A protein has these predicted regions:
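Bacterial N-terminal signal peptides that target proteins for export
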Residues: 6, 23-35
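Residues marking helix boundaries in flexible regions
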Residues: 7-10, 46, 51
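Short, Lys/Arg-enriched N-terminal segments with co-localized hydrophobic residues
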Residues: 11-21
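Bacterial N-terminal signal peptides
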Residues: 32-44
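Extended, histidine- and acidic-residue-enriched regions that form the cofactor-binding/catalytic faces
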Residues: 49-190, 194-319
Length: 319
């Protein structure tokens, strides 16, 4: 590109120098104008050459920077956003080549639960999954997902505070996130979702990238098991192993599993204090008035669900 530009400029100068008739003199005005133009052209060529030469040097400097040692000890986190680029580089080099992309949502969840319900559950669950895998990290939670038609509204969009994406936007977001993580060096990229509306988009993205990547240096896996049968399996575990079962339904988009797991991250996001004050510290017949007991119940649920999901991830990654 640069050589063509220089050649074009040089050709122009040669033609201008050769054309000495009156028409040319009118164009340049006088010999001083011609010399001035020639100086400008030569300066442009010289500057272009200067700008082109540092490419190899810049690549060398970048390679040195990318290989530099950390100046301080590494921090500890399973969340990509809480790590430095050097820490991520070293973790990948040490074998942490699996990255989990968790998808949540912002939606209505009855009178007690914050709209970020799914995101709060993922905050507690994803690091547990990564720890059980032993070679994985968690990408930032994708907090915006399809929640219904925006205008006219449908589904959760009928309630204030819900944020919805179109299916196309959601899938485009996941495509770019997944491709970015592949570029970083992760070889197994895992999609999980805590909500039913997230599942088809993740399946579509996994299918598209599986075809386009063709297993060249990374693979993408949609692990539906986190949601289905992950939720149902967790409910069965709670009933059979812990002896806790709902005795009624209060009519809300809420249950003991959601509530207890949210409380592990932040009890106030289920309005624990306000419910205690109002005498409404229960859901579907199960009391949550003992904060310690409710949080411990949530931890057991998360432990089970994380183990269930980690097993599913191992299965797909090993195939």
């Amino acid at each position: 590109m640069l050589s063509l530009r220089i050649k074009a400029i040089a050709t122009s100068v040669g033609a201008a120098h050769k054309d000495t008739d009156m028409k040319t003199m009118k164009t340049f005005g006088n010999s001083n104008s011609f010399l001035l133009l020639l100086l400008v052209v030569l300066s442009t060529i010289a500057q272009a050459q200067i700008n082109s030469t540092p490419t190899a040097q810049q690549e060398t400097e970048l390679a040195i920077q990318l290989a530099a040692d950390r100046p301080i000890a590494a921090g500890q986190s399973y969340w990509l956003e809480e790590l430095t680029w050097m820490e991520i580089r070293d973790l990948i080099a040490d074998g942490a080549t699996t990255i989990i992309i968790p998808t949540g949502g912002i939606e209505e969840n009855g009178p007690y639960l914050a709209t970020g319900k799914h995101n709060l559950i993922l905050e507690a669950t994803c690091p547990e999954i990564a720890e059980k895998l032993g070679n994985a990290l968690c990408a930032p939670i994708v907090k915006f997902v399809p929640e219904g038609n925006i205008d006219p509204p449908s589904g959760s969009m009928l309630f204030p505070g819900t944020i919805s994406l179109t299916q196309a936007t959601y899938e485009a977001l996941l495509l770019d996130i997944s491709s970015s993580l592949k570029q970083s060096g992760f070889t197994d990229i895992v999609l999980i979702g805590d909500s039913g509306g997230n599942q088809s988009g993740m399946a579509n993205v996994a299918a598209k990238l599986t075809e386009s990547w063709n297993s060249e240096s990374a693979r993408i896996h949609f692990v539906r098991e986190f949601y289905d049968p992950g939720w149902e399996a967790t409910e069965q575990y709670t009933e059979r192993e812990l002896g806790i079962a709902e005795s009624r339904h209060d009519g809300y988009h809420d249950d003991i599993w959601v509530t207890a797991m949210m409380m592990v991250t932040e009890p106030e996001q289920v309005r624990y204090r306000q419910r205690i004050e109002a005498g409404l510290a229960s859901i579907n017949g199960i009391a949550i008035d003992s904060l310690d007991e409710a949080v411990q119940l949530g931890r057991k649920m998360i432990e089970f669900r994380a183990g269930f999901t980690a097993d599913a991830i191992r299965d797909v990654v090993s195939n």
